[in-house]
Amino acid sequence: MDENQSHILSELQRLYPDAKPELNFSDPYETLVATILSAQCTDQRVNMVTPAVFRDFPDVHAMAQTTPEVLYPYVKSCGFSAKARNIVAACRVIEERFGGQVPDTMEALTSLPGVGRKTASVVLAFAFGKPAMPVDTHVFRVSNRLGLSQADSVEQTERQLMALIPEEDWSKAHHWLIYHGRRVCHSQKPDCGHCTLSPWCKAHSTVMINPKRDIENRRREKRGATNG
């Protein structure tokens, strides 16, 4: 870790000491469902949808017994009918292969329909308290702009951040980067003028943020988000 990276992580911790998940969930099943729904959708929208979902489908067994056609009206405002199909299919696999219990390993989670490394990492970190570094669109964008990573994919970004940041801080750093991405380091118009990280930021110092580059970065972000 170089001096700039150390300053950036310290400042992120100072800025967002109480950063935490903004999705509402209370157990591994709810974490899995909410995270699948959150792909390319705001947490606020997901939080509006999930109370009815969890009321009528309170556990893996109930979800496995329904159909995508029944579930879809509950979640259609979150976009993509594939989300309903994947949620039902994932719960059926959990019933059949894992005794109705959401698995707690990366290998098992990513074997579920519609579950990629990001979704699996969220479940591991926030449902099971296991070390994981979920990389969503905000983490990918902000970490690469700041110089905490230098990668063309979410998978590379995940590996680089895990190598850079102490394991005990992975989940916290995930939230620091999300908070900063939502509040300051926006995708299209980053508020560099009010960013206290500017003195150490690679993008700010090299004038990396420009419309053409950001268009390509957003394309990469969308590809990564679509892959869960």
Model-derived regions: residue spans:
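Short, basic, low-complexity termini and linkers enriched in Ser/Thr/Gly/Pro
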Residues: 215, 220, 225-228
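Catalytic cores of DNA base-excision repair glycosylases
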Residues: 2-215
